[in-house]
């Protein structure tokens, strides 16, 4: 919800000008996903509330993204953690036939199949994915970047992978989208888009300060820190 408020603030600001780019730390729309424990602990009413809330958030996000695109703003989602998404194995662009595995595992299997040391970045995509519960369609690219100029034996620690996505009806040229991402990463000497890394670091500091202040005001012990961090 906070992210939605920030997107609305950006929409109404002087920064949302034609030719500008908005990078979202995460997907353009949230996947229709229920935590594993919900099937055992949540009531039917609570599940419906969660589902309705998720659909509302997605519809509001898409409205904002549509308005930004009409203003000439490029809106791109960057997903850094691929262990909970399964788009690659569902579409299977490399014809690996490995069953349902997460995106990170799929990329690893692809590198093992080609049996080649990753010496330079490569791209998987674009992949067209329709949302589970709506008519929203996204285009996705997976960027795989080696960590070292001279990699050691192939392994997950030798490369960084992340997903770039945008709405299919985006009017920007697809090569222009990737150019923006590459400029903010490779051209700045970073494996991931530098803008997101800077913001992520600032957010963690702000969150840490909020937790410290909460513990100070409530008089909670340090042992309670973990619990309240998870709540925040």
Segments predicted by a language model, with ranges:
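Long, contiguous domain-sized segments
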Residues: 2-232
């Amino acid at each position: 919800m906070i992210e939605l408020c920030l997107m609305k603030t950006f929409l109404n600001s002087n920064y949302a000008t034609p030719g500008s780019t908005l990078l979202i730390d995460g997907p353009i729309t949230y996947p229709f996903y229920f935590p594993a424990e919900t099937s055992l602990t949540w009531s039917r009413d609570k599940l419906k509330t969660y589902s309705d809330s998720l659909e509302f958030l997605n519809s509001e996000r898409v409205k904002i993204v549509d308005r930004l695109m009409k203003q000439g703003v490029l809106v791109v989602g960057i997903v850094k953690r691929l262990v909970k998404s399964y788009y690659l194995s569902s579409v299977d662009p490399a014809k690996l036939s490995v069953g349902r595995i997460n995106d990170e595992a799929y990329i690893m299997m692809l590198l093992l199949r080609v049996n080649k040391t990753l010496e330079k970045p490569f791209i998987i995509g674009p992949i067209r994915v329709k949302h589970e519960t709506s008519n929203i369609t996204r285009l996705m690219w997976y960027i795989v970047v080696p960590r070292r100029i001279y990699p050691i034996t192939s392994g997950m620690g030798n490369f960084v992978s992340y997903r770039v996505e945008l709405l299919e009806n985006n009017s920007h040229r697809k090569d222009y989208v990737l150019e923006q991402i590459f400029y903010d990463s490779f051209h700045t000497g970073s494996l991931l888009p530098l803008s997101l890394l800077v913001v992520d670091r600032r957010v963690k500091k702000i969150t840490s300060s909020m937790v410290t202040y909460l513990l100070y005001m409530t008089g909670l012990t340090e042992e309670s820190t973990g619990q309240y961090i998870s709540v925040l």
